[in-house]
């Protein structure tokens, strides 16, 4: 065959040939082709698309050039220069709110509700008006519009908190939050340390608590209490007797309204908040947080997530995490500078699910304890093996999409399995963020699949204004806390006594950036412990760099102790492993320098224990099971199994446990207000059980 004949043999058909061929096809065949083409086009147009990651997710942080101590920065940044501000016109909390007024076009700002009622909203300009009235009222009462003027704020989350806070910021005053879970002694300490002469309280009961301090001559500096709710004349008289003026928030507003003072906004370097952190030992420490600290941390979040999320006036935040902590403060700052709405819960955590259904938030910040409850409740309702299998199967299918970067809530599995879960949160959540404590990878991964929204995990502490690391859009894997935020550097330093070496990519997490605090109020000794001479914040957490440039928190430097044979023990690491047991709600691992082994006090999970025990042929009430020696042995065996799977060394495993039926709590003095274990108090509380275990266990 000639070459030209070969070409002619393989030539593409002419268009006229195709037309003639199509004309010969039956109508049904043509309709089938058309339907197939339409379906293909529809699939292509509506197929789930992966979120665009802001950088190469296989290398989310990079080492700073020319350094020898392993300093790393976010790969989101174009160079080694850290982000300071995201918006040029937002450099203080005051600026952020003013931007919110503009971009919202004076839209709704703060919302609250009464029982069984819808949310009622006040606009951005109404908030600004009330804030200026309150600030002017304070000035009329003799308070100075400067960053040396501290104003106490003792309240649950509610619109008045933001209004009072903005009133302070409008005149460069500094907010000092108080919260009742601190306890009376700690509140007295803070009032004196910050020399608070005026405190805003939401309820008369809190005003009475404050008055007790003055009456007992413990807080002589306190002169004015402003109360948000209504109160009786007896409280006014009681205040007069000890030299404290009791005034309503409305009266202070009215005073400022007729004595208006032009705002005196703060500078970025001015103090904004003195956030007292509850330590596990000693008095609270007052972290001095500037406007720049807060705006810088907000800017870091916005920059890290901008490829997939930018808050807008359509967004609604549910405010229930304490505003006395920096996590919620930073989240609300991000919302306000974008003109979004903030709806407050009714003040009762038991009504939160009802508030969520009514408010239908799009932004939902959470803490691990709430996530664990959600996870347990979901699987608790899946009371048959078939239901559990379906949940697990659907979750695995959506987890495969997550690994491809796809986040959605409209898949077949969402419609069949997860719709009710999503509806329980209002049905419109598009972003969740968790922080403040470690969260189980199992829990986080499942809820990411079930809730079908962008779900970020952050890491930080009060001293770096809430966050210093954050997971990035597109990386929905669990088991790490993300990469350094674009506003700060992170490095690891050696902790030789625990065998963590920076050269091996492990060590104490240290942070440096414009989000790092200025020190502790009137406490140079503890400031020097936290901040070194080069401005690095030493967190006390042990981290490990993963191959993709993310950070994994693996241990805690504090609370380490030696056993008799000289081995170092980090009890919190062991506790976090043991908490993976289905039967366990809380665990306290204890060791002593004169003893060669560890023991633990375990509080079983009141909801999970009965079914867990039944699978092992054991029955009884919760209290009976807690006293059952067979349950004790079964729980111990489960803990040891988990420890072995997690790679604990033999000396890191407990040799015996005491089962205790009552949860460690703030009320019984065994947890701090931020739900961290008070180890000295736990040691004293369980001294008899500890002594008995050491006396009876022979190794």
From Swiss-Prot:
The UniProt record lists the keyword Zinc-finger: no
Positions bearing N6-acetyllysine: 208, 357, 387, 633
Keywords: Acetylation, ATP-binding, Endoplasmic reticulum, Fatty acid metabolism, Glycoprotein, Ligase, Lipid metabolism, Magnesium, Membrane, Microsome, Mitochondrion, Mitochondrion outer membrane, Nitration, Nucleotide-binding, Peroxisome, Phosphoprotein, Signal-anchor, Transmembrane, Transmembrane helix
Glycosylation sites noted in the Swiss-Prot or TrEMBL record: 136
Molecular function as annotated in GO: arachidonate-CoA ligase activity; ATP binding; long-chain fatty acid-CoA ligase activity; oleoyl-CoA ligase activity; palmitoyl-CoA ligase activity; phytanate-CoA ligase activity; pristanate-CoA ligase activity; protein serine/threonine kinase activator activity
Modified residues annotated as 3'-nitrotyrosine in this record: 9, 86
Topology of the protein relative to the lipid bilayer: Single-pass type III membrane protein
Pfam families: AMP-binding
Regulation: Inhibited at high temperature and by arachidonate.
One annotated GO biological process: positive regulation of long-chain fatty acid import across plasma membrane
Keyword Nucleotide-binding: yes
Cofactor(s) in the UniProt record: Mg(2+)
Function field: Catalyzes the conversion of long-chain fatty acids to their active form acyl-CoAs for both synthesis of cellular lipids, and degradation via beta-oxidation. Preferentially uses palmitoleate, oleate and linoleate. Preferentially activates arachidonate than epoxyeicosatrienoic acids (EETs) or hydroxyeicosatrienoic acids (HETEs).
Protein name per the record: Long-chain-fatty-acid--CoA ligase 1
């Amino acid at each position: 065959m000639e070459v030209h004949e070969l070409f002619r043999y393989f030539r593409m058909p002419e268009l006229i040939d195709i037309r003639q061929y199509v004309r010969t096809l039956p109508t049904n065949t043509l309709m089938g082709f058309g339907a197939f083409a339409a379906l293909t086009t529809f699939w292509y147009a509506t197929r789930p698309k992966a979120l665009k990651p802001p950088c190469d997710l296989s290398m989310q942080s990079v080492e700073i050039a020319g350094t020898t101590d392993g300093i790393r920065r976010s790969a989101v940044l174009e160079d080694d220069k850290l982000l300071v501000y995201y918006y040029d016109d937002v450099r203080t909390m005051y600026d952020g709110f003013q931007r919110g007024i503009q971009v919202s076009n004076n839209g709704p700002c703060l919302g609250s509700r009464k029982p069984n009622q819808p949310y009622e909203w006040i606009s951005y300009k109404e908030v600004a008006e009330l804030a200026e009235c309150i600030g002017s009222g304070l000035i009329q009462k003799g308070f100075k519009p400067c960053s040396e003027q501290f104003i106490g704020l003792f309240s649950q989350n509610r619109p008045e908190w933001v209004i009072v806070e903005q009133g302070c910021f409008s005149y460069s005053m500094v907010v000092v939050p108080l919260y009742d879970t601190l306890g009376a002694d700690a509140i007295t300490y803070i009032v004196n340390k910050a020399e608070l002469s005026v405190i805003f309280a939401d309820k008369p009961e809190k005003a009475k608590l404050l008055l007790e301090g003055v009456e007992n001559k413990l807080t002589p500096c306190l002169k004015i209490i402003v109360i948000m709710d209504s109160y009786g004349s007896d409280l006014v008289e009681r205040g007069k007797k000890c030299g404290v003026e009791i005034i309503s928030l409305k009266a202070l507003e009215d005073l400022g309204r007729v004595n208006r003072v032009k705002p005196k906004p703060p500078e970025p370097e001015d103090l904004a908040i003195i956030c007292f952190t509850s330590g596990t030992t000693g008095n609270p420490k007052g972290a001095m947080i500037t406007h720049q600290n807060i705006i810088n941390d907000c800017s870091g979040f916005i920059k890290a997530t901008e490829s997939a999320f930018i808050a807008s006036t359509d967004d609604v935040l549910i405010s229930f995490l304490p505003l006395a902590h920096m996590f919620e403060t930073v989240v609300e700052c991000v919302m306000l500078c974008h003109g979004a709405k903030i709806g407050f819960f009714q003040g009762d955590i038991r009504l939160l699910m009802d508030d969520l259904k009514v408010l239908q938030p799009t932004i939902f910040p959470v803490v691990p304890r709430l996530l664990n409850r959600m996870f347990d409740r979901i699987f608790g309702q899946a009371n048959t093996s078939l239901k559990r299998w379906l949940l697990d199967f659907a979750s695995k299918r959506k987890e495969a999409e997550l690994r491809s970067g796809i986040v959605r809530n409209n898949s077949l599995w969402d419609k069949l399995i997860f719709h009710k879960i999503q509806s329980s949160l209002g049905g419109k959540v598009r972003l969740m963020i968790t922080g403040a404590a470690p969260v189980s990878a199992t829990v986080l991964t499942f809820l990411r699949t079930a809730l079908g929204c962008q779900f970020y995990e952050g890491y930080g502490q009060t001293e770096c204004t809430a966050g210093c690391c954050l997971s990035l859009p597109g990386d929905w894997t669990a088991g790490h806390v993300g990469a350094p935020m674009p506003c700060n550097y992170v490095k690891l330093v050696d902790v030789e006594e625990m065998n963590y070496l920076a050269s091996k990519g492990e060590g104490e997490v240290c942070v440096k950036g414009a989000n790092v605090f200025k020190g502790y109020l009137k406490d140079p000794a503890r400031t020097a412990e936290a901040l070194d001479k080069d401005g690095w914040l030493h967190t006390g957490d042990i981290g490990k760099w993963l191959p993709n440039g993310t950070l994994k928190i693996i241990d805690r430097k504090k609370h380490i102790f030696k056993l008799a044979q000289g081995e170092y023990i980090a009890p919190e690491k062991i506790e976090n492993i043991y908490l993976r047991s289905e039967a366990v709600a809380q665990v306290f691992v204890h060791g002593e320098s004169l003893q060669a082994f560890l023991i633990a006090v375990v509080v079983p999970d009141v909801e999970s224990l009965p079914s867990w025990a039944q699978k092992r042929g054991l029955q009884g009430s919760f209290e009976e099971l807690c006293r059952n020696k067979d349950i004790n042995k079964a729980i111990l065996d489960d803990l040891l199994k988990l420890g072995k799977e997690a790679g604990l060394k033999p000396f890191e495993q407990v040799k015996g446990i005491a089962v205790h039926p009552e949860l460690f709590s703030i009320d019984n003095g065994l947890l701090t207000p931020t739900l961290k274990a008070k180890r000295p108090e736990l040691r004293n509380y369980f001294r008899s059980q500890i002594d008995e275990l050491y006396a009876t266990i022979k190794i």
